[in-house]
């Protein structure tokens, strides 16, 4: 990495702090507000300079698409698989379910992302998850009420906010036009929690 100016180092330090405390990079507006820049454009120019010097990678189209590069290693990352249609009873990451692989670093998300899922519809629009977005998912069965989860019912995969009351699961949309999905675990045997949402990549990022 080439040497940084004092201001560039200040921006880089902010990126690292924000990642450590929130699990995601700051937006340009957040950088500007924190460091007293007059506009988000000023933050963008500093980010471009950091990118040219090899300190970060900017992922186009994602408002938080900033990855801090580990300059101790030049290893390339493998990318994240995009999961398509899923057959009931098979692992979600089975080879036949993988439609593509995107060159996205899993460590850009906290906790680390394991796969991407394309979002269909607007049931989660009130939390900024929009039709066509790529949702980054961390595979886990250890989930809490209130988290946004990826759930599978038979061969249907859905993204909703979780609420569990005893043996009843409520999967809540973030759009008042959609009713909750109710699952009785004593009756529905083909139900799985596949993971939690850890980030999104806006739907025009890969055009």
UniProtKB/Swiss-Prot annotation:
An annotated Gene Ontology molecular function: serine-type endopeptidase activity
KW Repressor (keyword) present: yes
The entry's keywords: Autocatalytic cleavage, DNA damage, DNA repair, DNA replication, DNA-binding, Hydrolase, Repressor, SOS response, Transcription, Transcription regulation
InterPro entries from the UniProt entry: LexA (IPR006200), LexA-like (IPR039418), LexA/Signal_pep-like_sf (IPR036286), LexA_DNA-bd_dom (IPR006199), LexA_repressor (IPR050077), Peptidase_S24_LexA (IPR006197), Peptidase_S24_S26A/B/C (IPR015927), WH-like_DNA-bd_sf (IPR036388)
Entry EC no(s): 3.4.21.88
Protein name (Swiss-Prot/TrEMBL): LexA repressor
Catalytic activity: Hydrolysis of Ala-|-Gly bond in repressor LexA
GO BP of this protein: DNA repair; DNA replication; negative regulation of DNA-templated transcription; proteolysis; SOS response
């Amino acid at each position: 990495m080439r040497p940084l100016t004092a201001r560039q180092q200040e921006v880089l330090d902010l990126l690292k702090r924000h990642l450590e405390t929130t699990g995601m990079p700051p937006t340009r507006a957040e950088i500007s507000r924190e460091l007293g820049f007059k506009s988000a454009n000023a933050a963008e120019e500093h980010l471009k300079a950091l990118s040219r010097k090899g300190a970060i990678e900017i992922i186009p189209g994602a408002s938080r698409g900033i990855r801090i590069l580990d300059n101790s290693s030049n290893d390339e990352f493998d990318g994240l698989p995009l999961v398509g249609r899923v057959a009931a009873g098979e692992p979600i990451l089975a080879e036949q379910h993988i439609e593509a692989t995107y060159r996205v670093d899993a460590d850009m998300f906290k906790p680390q992302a394991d796969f991407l899922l394309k979002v269909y519809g607007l049931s989660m629009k009130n939390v900024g998850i929009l039709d066509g977005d790529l949702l980054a998912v961390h595979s886990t069965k250890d989930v809490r009420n209130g988290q946004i989860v990826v759930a599978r019912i038979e061969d249907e995969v859905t993204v909703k906010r979780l609420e569990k009351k005893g043996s009843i699961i409520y999967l809540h949309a973030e759009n008042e036009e959609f009713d909750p999905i109710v699952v009785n675990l004593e009756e529905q045997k083909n139900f799985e929690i596949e993971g939690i949402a850890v980030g999104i990549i806006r739907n025009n990022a890969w055009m």
